[in-house]
Amino acid sequence: MPNENQKPNLYSLFSNGHLQTIWTSIVGKYTLKKTSKFFFTRTRFKTPDNDFLDFDWLVNKKKTESSTLLVLFHGIEGSSDSQYSLAFANIAIENSWSFVVINFRGCSGEINLAPRAYHAGDTEEIDWVLKKIDSIVTADTIFCVGISLGGNALLKWLSMHDRALYSNLSRLKAIAVVSAPLDLVSSGKKLENEVNGIIYSRFFLRTMKKKAKHKWNQFPGLFDLENVICAKTMKQFDNSFTAPVHKFLNVHDYWKKSSSIDEIKFITSHSLIVNAKNDPIVPSFNIKDLNITSENVEYWNPNFGGHVGFSSKINLKKFESQFLWMPRMIGNWFLKTHKTQ
């Protein structure tokens, strides 16, 4: 469990979940792009369905592969350009790790080719990615971190991996998920809140609708385009696009089958679940709700952090703050956990 004494230094104003979320997303990205002295190189891999996935690797100036690789699965409409991707890249550099961000389909700046996109329960995609990585890297140790939607998919995959429903990846030593919507139904309801709908749903839908239009142009009739264009909530979008495109009956079927909350009891691998109590998108869970059965699964529920926020040492005069607090804590947890194995 991360040290409870390691808490972010926040102004009371920024203890608000919305402000934590928005500040980190906007100012964090600007600050990290300005201060980070690294760049990514892209490798494109052909998928089994004749599509492609882009893996963005942190360029290693030492030209030697690290014995440890950190793999990041991003959140909804994220990419290697997201604030948290840049933050974890910095942590990888601090620890001399290799680092790669997996851009989900359609998230690397180019529309994918197949009649599909990405979704919160795509365990087959996670499995294919990790097996591909396992086949091409020489690192002795692999850690994975999943952010929001990517965290839910990663956690659901791990539960299946630990039940031997997917082949064993012996070099995978631990995973961490941050702000993951473990229960998509309750998260969906929270996004339908009037304030959340205005702030977050409209933001996500702006780009998701554009991608959906491109997908319809590729595959006319794949879904009801008019319903997608008219969608005003994530629930409506998932019911009109995500569910039918990925062979779910409807949004309720998609959310129920893709949620990881009922899968956690099957996990035996070293795992850390981090959800802030003031997350405006993901409900805060009581540890009893998660039905954790293994001592290897840890749950941390800090008071502050928002949705993938967790900024600290906020200085309004200089319009800056520290955005590496949570990624650094997770990096330290990976190191500590691996030492005890």
Model-identified regions with their sequence ranges:
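Catalytic nucleophile-loop/oxyanion-hole region of alpha/beta-hydrolase
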Residues: 105-143
